[in-house]
């Protein structure tokens, strides 16, 4: 499986959909597949081949699957889920103790380094975080960030969905089962959505689509 792919890109200041992101995507999942194959071959030698694997020199019929990991990603620190982009860099969650901020760990590090985040009890920090929440987790309207930072820190609804599908297609050859691929579409017409689905349908490496999240908001710009 895999989790926090987008978080990894954010930690390394890599723009989703860039050539570098494609190199990382290829290297990451080809390495996982290589290690998994070596492991199942070793297990077959040590424990023997199951009846359905006789003659293939492996212990497993399937090796890799990418689950959504939505709950797990939240529990381990609000990292990005599975192979999907981060929906927002700040949001609020109601708990028995009251309302708390959930902040993407990469974004938290950035705003701490820039001196924007002082503490969660600080009035200026709270105003900043609530402003991000009010913009669906987007930072594109904030003057504290450079254009390069804004390019890296785009939410799922601001990332070009075709770039997302291209990464899905690229890694599928290393994944045994279909990926849990979510689509995040902002301000798209029915015709544009149909065109996107056709793009996915005609790609032999895109085996399924999971959830389709739609958003109508004039403040959200997809790049």
What are these regions (language model features)?
Residues 3, 38, 105-106:
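A generic alpha-helix surface/boundary motif
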Residues 9-69, 148, 180, 196:
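Internal maturation/activation junctions in enzymes
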Residues 1-4, 9-27, 152-155, 171-188:
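Conserved alpha/beta enzyme-core scaffolds, especially Rossmann-like or related mixed alpha/beta domains
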Residues 64-223:
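Catalytic alpha/beta core of large soluble enzyme barrels
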């Amino acid at each position: 499986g895999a989790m926090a792919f987008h978080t990894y890109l954010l930690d390394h200041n890599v723009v989703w959909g860039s050539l570098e992101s494609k190199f990382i995507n290829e290297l990451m999942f080809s390495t996982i597949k290589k290690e998994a194959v070596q492991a199942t071959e070793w297990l077959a030698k040590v424990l023997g081949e199951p009846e359905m694997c006789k003659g293939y020199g492996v212990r497993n019929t399937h090796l890799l699957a990418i689950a959504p990991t939505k709950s797990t990603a939240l529990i381990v620190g609000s990292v990005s889920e599975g192979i999907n982009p981060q929906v927002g860099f700040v949001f609020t969650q109601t708990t028995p103790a009251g309302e708390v901020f959930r902040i993407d760990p990469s974004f938290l590090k950035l705003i701490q380094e820039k001196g924007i985040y002082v503490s969660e009890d600080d009035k200026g920090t709270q105003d900043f975080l609530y402003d991000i929440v009010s913009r669906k987790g987007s930072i594109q309207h904030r003057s504290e960030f450079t254009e390069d930072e804004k390019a890296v820190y785009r939410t799922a609804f601001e990332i070009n969905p075709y770039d997302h599908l291209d990464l899905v297609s690229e890694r599928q050859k290393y994944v045994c089962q279909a990926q849990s691929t979510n689509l995040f579409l902002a301000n798209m017409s029915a015709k544009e959505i149909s065109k996107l689905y056709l793009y996915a349908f005609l790609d032999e490496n895109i085996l399924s689509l999971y959830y389709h999240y739609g958003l109508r908001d004039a403040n959200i710009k997809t790049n």
